[in-house]
From Swiss-Prot:
Its main location: membrane. Belongs to the ATPase epsilon chain family. It is found in: Cell inner membrane. Keywords: ATP synthesis, Cell inner membrane, Cell membrane, CF(1), Hydrogen ion transport, Ion transport, Membrane, Transport. It is a peripheral membrane protein. The lineage of its organism: Bacteria, Pseudomonadati, Pseudomonadota, Betaproteobacteria, Burkholderiales. InterPro entries: ATP_F1_dsu/esu_C_sf (IPR036794), ATP_synth_F1_dsu/esu (IPR001469), ATP_synth_F1_dsu/esu_N (IPR020546), ATP_synth_F1_esu_C (IPR020547), ATPsynth_dsu/esu_N (IPR036771). This is ATP synthase epsilon chain. One of its GO terms (cellular component) is proton-transporting ATP synthase complex. It comes from Herminiimonas arsenicoxydans. F-type ATPases have 2 components, CF(1) - the catalytic core - and CF(0) - the membrane proton channel. CF(1) has five subunits: alpha(3), beta(3), gamma(1), delta(1), epsilon(1). CF(0) has three main subunits: a, b and c. One of its GO terms (molecular function) is ATP binding.
Length: 140
């Protein structure tokens, strides 16, 4: 069995990460997923949260925030097709906190004509982004 696998993290806008990795952890729809080289093929939806990539030969893990998407696992590679993806180093805590505040206000305001499902999705994404920022801080 190989010790590394090819990992691709892409969004509609750009390729966020492409390289060899020893391990990938990410938030699956049913819970946290850990992928090692040679993993059984799998296609599943992913929830908003942090993707942690253990890069071969590096002490520091790579972090990418994804706002949901699809995970495809093949024996020699992993592809994350994210709705939105942001490199861990590019996460903006103030912006995420403001998005959370606005989504909470929209859900509380009974007189506004909002799409509650959309507001709830935006709130979940903002909360997941803030949690990813906290995780990234703990790792450093």
């Amino acid at each position: 069995m190989a010790h590394t696998m090819r990992v691709e993290v892409v969004s509609a806008e750009e390729e966020i990460f492409s390289g060899e990795a020893e391990f990938v952890a990410l938030p699956g729809e049913s819970g946290e997923l850990g992928i090692l080289p040679g993993h059984t093929p799998l296609i599943t939806r992913i929830r908003p949260g942090a993707v942690r990539i253990k890069i071969a030969g590096q002490a520091e893990d790579e972090f990418v925030f994804v706002a949901g998407g699809i995970l495809e696992v093949q024996p020699h590679g992993v592809t994350v097709l994210a709705d939105t993806a942001i490199r861990g180093a590019d996460l903006d805590e103030a912006k995420a906190a403001e998005a959370k505040r606005l989504a909470e206000e929209a859900l509380v305001n009974k007189e506004s004509k909002i799409d509650y499902a959309q507001a709830q999705a935006e709130l979940a994404t903002a909360i997941a982004q803030l949690a990813a920022i906290q995780r990234l801080r703990q790792k450093r």
